[in-house]
A protein has these predicted regions:
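Cysteine-centric segments in proteins
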Residues: 9-120
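N-terminal signal peptide c-region/cleavage motif recognized by signal peptidases
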Residues: 3-5
Length: 120
């Protein structure tokens, strides 16, 4: 059976908060970014964290945030991170705190991501 996960060496961890509820999303390096699913956040947003690479080598990271609309998810942010990444063993902040506002009443999605286990 094919698995897109290649290693647990590099770990991307994102804390995503909507309406006072926080979800912790942990992402491992994958070979194929198209196999990574989006995660429903409170029925209002979708969040997708993609880390492409192999083992502790990370080629790139892409983060996507979508507003869930009646017709289809609407992209409200795409963030792209390219090497070099810090190579420390404790988690390193990648994004800082991001606050996104979307929809007719300006709903707020908050997230921050850290990265650990990356090799040069």
């Amino acid at each position: 059976m094919y698995s897109p996960m290649v290693s647990a060496d590099a770990l991307l961890r994102c804390d995503v908060t909507y309406a006072g509820s926080t979800q912790v999303l942990e992402t491992l390096a994958v070979n194929d970014p198209y196999t990574v699913p989006s995660v429903d956040i409170g029925g209002r947003f979708w969040f997708k964290a993609v880390m492409v690479g192999h083992a502790a080598r990370v080629d790139y990271i892409k983060l996507y945030a979508y507003l869930d609309t009646r017709t289809q998810p609407l992209l409200i942010q795409e963030a792209i991170f390219l090497p070099p990444f810090k190579t420390t063993s404790p988690p390193t902040p990648l994004t800082g705190t991001q606050r996104l506002y979307a929809g007719p009443v300006g709903r707020e999605l908050i997230y921050s991501c850290t990265l650990q286990g990356v090799q040069p």
